Amino acid sequence: MKLKEYFPSILRSFALKNKSVSKIKSRNKNTVPLIVSLTTIPSRLKLVQYTVRSLLCANPQPDKIILWLNEDLESAVPAGLKALEGDVFEIRYSPYTFSHRKLIHSLELFPDRIIVTVDDDVMYHPNLLGQLYKSHLQYPKDIIANRVRSISYNEQGEVLPYKQWKHVTSSSIEDMTMMPVGVCGVLYPVGSLNKQVLNVDLFQELSPKSDDLWFKTMALLNGTLSRFAPYTVEDPIPLVGSQKVALKKTNVNEDRNRVQWENLALHFNIDLKEK
C-alpha cells in the first residue's frame, strides 16, 4: 500500500463504519440485475466488512452480494460482518481455500445471471456497479473490466514477465490478449466462460494461484472478448492492513503469473502471439 493511500483509506473506513447498519443492509429502490461475488481469507476477516459496506452503499445496488468463506471460518465470523446480512448481502461457505471460489460457486448457483467479481482488500466507489452495467449494455457479449492488461510476448514469441504486460486504457481495443484484473471489478455475462471453469482439479494443477488467468483462459475457450470498460470509475481505495498476506507477492513479485499462463497456454493449445 502506498503512503499517499493511507489517509483516504482511514477516512473512507471511518465513514463506512459510522453508517447505520439497518439503513445500508436494506434493499435500495435503485438496482441493477447483478450478482456480486467475492471471497476472503482469515487474515482479512475483520476487514472485509468495509468492502461489503462499500458495496451495500452502491447506487445503484446489486440484486445480491455473496461472500464465500471457507467452511472452517463459520464460527469465526465477526459480529460486525454478520450484522450486515439481510435482503442483499449473505455469507455462504465453501470447502475450498483458493481464490477461484470467488466466482465458481456463484456460477453454479446462478448460471443465468450476470456476475460481478470484486476483491476483498479495497473499498469501492458507489458508482462501480452502475458504470459496469452501463458498459455491459453497450457490449453485452463481452467481459467488462475496469483494469485490464495485455498478455505480452517478446520478439522471440516468449511470454514477457507479468510486470511488462501492457496496461490497457481504451475500450475500443478488441484483442484476445486482453486480461481482466480482478481488483477493480469484473463483469461476466451469462455464458461467457467455458464449462471447464468449474474443473477444480485442473485449475489447481495449472493455475492454482491466479484466478484471473484461469477465468481469462475459460473466456478464450468460449471465444469471449474481454474489454476495458467504456464507462470507468475511480480505482477502489485499499484497506489499511489488508496486504499482510497477498497473492501479488507471489504472482507478481516472483513472476508466477507468467509461469501459470505458460501452463494454461500449453495445456489448452492457446497461441496469442502476433503472427
Language-model features, listed with the residues they occupy:
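Short, acidic, metal-binding catalytic loop of nucleotide-sugar glycosyltransferases
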Residues: 51-63, 71, 83
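Active-site-proximal specificity loops/subdomain of glycosyltransferases
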Residues: 68-113
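C-terminal catalytic/acceptor-binding lobe
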Residues: 1-19, 29-32, 50, 202-275
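Conserved catalytic core of nucleotide-sugar-dependent glycosyltransferases
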Residues: 125-200
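Hydrophobic targeting segments
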Residues: 32-38, 55, 63-68
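Residues at the starts of beta-strands that form the adenosine-phosphate
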Residues: 63-64, 114, 225
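Short beta-strand-to-loop acidic/aromatic patch adjacent to the donor-nucleotide binding site
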Residues: 112-123
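Active-site beta-to-alpha loop of glycosyltransferases that engages the nucleotide-sugar donor
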Residues: 38-49
